[in-house]
Amino acid sequence: MSKFARGFAALVAATVLIATLGAAVGTAVAEENKPDRHAGYYYPPITSSETYEARAVAMADADRSQRIKFINNLTEQLLSRPYPPEYAIFAKGDEAQKMIIVGRRPGTFNTIYRARALLATLTAVARSSRLFNEFGVQEYFTFFDLAKLFGFSRITISDGESFTHQIHLK
């Protein structure tokens, strides 16, 4: 991709971001302040959290159906391996806007460092994806940005026992 095309793409992305930021901020704050009805059912109470300022904005066609297809594709990849998956990944919420990753074995993601190691691995996978390569963002975007492209508002990762970390995507 030429420098001009990259610059133009960045300008368009910045314009879209500025245009949507005002509407998104109010919705995101309301979402963050709601009680987490999935804590205590799919994972233990939140033990830590952070906010990620995404470099991406949701794609125009990002909807519930697209998010479910995305999760289904990830799950199919996990299940196609010759060994049992170490974690389950699924979407919840009225619009499937909440991504949840839960370890299936004791000690899998019981520290923030192990959780971040998985998220870094998912970033490496995302950066090799056709989508990132088509947009020319494989050096800049992370797995969090990929989740934002699909319209996810948060990612929760847990060991399923005592540790749960939640990332709010802005």
Question: What does each model-identified segment do?
Answer:
Residues 2-15:
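Bacterial N-terminal signal peptides that target proteins for export
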Residues 17-27:
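C-terminal segment of classical bacterial N-terminal signal peptides
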Residues 20, 92, 145-147:
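Generic marker of residues within folded, mature protein domains
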Residues 28-97, 107-110:
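N-proximal, solvent-exposed amphipathic alpha-helical segments enriched in charged/polar residues
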Residues 30, 121-125, 170:
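Ampiphathic alpha-helical segments that act as solvent-exposed interaction surfaces
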Residues 78-142:
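Mature extracytoplasmic domains of secretory-pathway proteins
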Residues 127-169:
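A short amphipathic beta-strand at an alpha->beta junction
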